[in-house]
Amino acid sequence: MGPDQEGLTYKAAGVDIDAGNELVDRIRDDVKRTMRPGVLGGLGGFGGLFEVPVDRYRRPVLVSGTDGVGTKLKLAIETGRHDGIGIDLVAMCANDVLVTGAEPLYFLDYYATGRLDVEVAAAVIRGIAEGCHQAGAALIGGETAEMPGMYAEGHYDLAGFCVGVVEKDEIIDGSRVGAGDALIALAASGPHSNGYSLIRKVLERAPEGAATEVDGQPVADLLMAPTRIYAKPVLDLIRNLPVHAMAHITGGGLPENLPRVLPEGLGAKLQPWSWPPVFRWLQQTGQIAEAEMLRTFNCGVGMVLVVPAEQADAALQRLRQTGETAWRLGEIGTHEAGAPRVQVVAA
């Protein structure tokens, strides 16, 4: 080492261990709020421990899911709205796990950035904890990675991991779906966490950008609304009424996601529904074709449930009693070769 050179430190290289410790202290109470029966140990261990609830499940099957929030994260960074993106992260994972009929048990997150901003990271993880609370899942661990030179200034990335449990003979896999079954839509809170690469292009065309008003609200509020988490109302429903299949409407919209849970030879016939104003604004501002809208966005439908036709009214009533906006979207019919598996038909 030369006479004018100082000794190197990890902090000088861009990694601040003290900031990481401060973050852990800041989020401790938020994480505690997510605790539930089954959690063993506390924050800071090398591995999160969770006891499988064999007292409530005869043949428990664990269901896992992992996801991110796509380029909605870039819009969150550009608008400085970091508190809701953590809810989005949990929702994308927990709603996927829920589709099998599984109860979310626990969640882990991965937060990566070039330089740790404790305020921003704490806001994100508060959102993750809130999402876990909504899903009924415990936040039992996570990783905060500070990697100098890997990300643009102020940028970060997120990934989430959720594990749930379902009784083996109660797994919902679509095998019981039959012609005549009813389709029930659960309302989305907005575009959720899909289609944001196209949304950002639309915003470039809007003269006022994210400050544009749609239906009396800044479009940024509508676009950054956290993804709805359906775990509690849907679990309540499947414990009381038969559900043959569920589809989480994410990337690819209804045309791509609904067929994933339908047996061969069956298709979905949807009745037209009223799209929330933000989707019509996106369509008009971006001059986006209807088919492209349906393949990119949820267009107001966050989840679809397939139930026996004779149970549709009871299912709607129960979902509405638990606070969901739900309506009859259509029905299952036979699928003719060469025709789309999902069709919007005249009422």
From Swiss-Prot:
The reaction(s) this protein catalyses: 2-formamido-N(1)-(5-O-phospho-beta-D-ribosyl)acetamidine + ATP = 5-amino-1-(5-phospho-beta-D-ribosyl)imidazole + ADP + phosphate + H(+)
SUPFAM superfamilies: PurM C-terminal domain-like (SSF56042), PurM N-terminal domain-like (SSF55326)
InterPro entries documented for this protein: PurM-like_C_dom, PurM-like_C_sf, PurM-like_N, PurM-like_N_sf, PurM_cligase
TM region(s), chain numbering: none
GO-annotated molecular function: ATP binding; phosphoribosylamine-glycine ligase activity; phosphoribosylformylglycinamidine cyclo-ligase activity
Cellular component aspect of the GO annotation: cytosol
The keyword Endoplasmic reticulum is annotated on this UniProt entry: no
CDD domains: PurM
Gene3D superfamilies per record: PurM-like C-terminal domain, PurM-like, N-terminal domain
Entry's localization field: Cytoplasm
One Pfam family of this chain: AIRS
Keywords from the UniProt entry: ATP-binding, Cytoplasm, Ligase, Nucleotide-binding, Purine biosynthesis
PANTHER family per UniProt: TRIFUNCTIONAL PURINE BIOSYNTHETIC PROTEIN ADENOSINE-3, TRIFUNCTIONAL PURINE BIOSYNTHETIC PROTEIN ADENOSINE-3-RELATED
Family: Belongs to the AIR synthase family.
Name of the molecule in the record: Phosphoribosylformylglycinamidine cyclo-ligase
Species whose genome carries this gene: Alkalilimnicola ehrlichii (strain ATCC BAA-1101 / DSM 17681 / MLHE-1)
